[in-house]
Amino acid sequence: MPSTTYRLLWRAVRERRQVTFVSERKHREAYPVVLGYTATGEEALFAYQVGGHTSAGDKLPGWRCFYVNGIRELTSHKGGWL
């Protein structure tokens, strides 16, 4: 059964909502595009990150993959995609 966070992200994908969340102790602003599972069965999000912080050397905006179990403080926002 999908996690609560996965279900919230699924709704954001379906409704084309921007999301904000914390991942790896960094604030992120992104457009969620694809939800699925890794080869080992972990829930994963593929998103276009447009704001917030990112790993050293990564530029914004850009495509990112996040493990859903590492996403905290998830909120979605009304408004269209880019």
Spell out what each predicted region is:
Residues 1-82:
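Core beta-strand-centered patch of the WYL/Sm-like small regulatory domain
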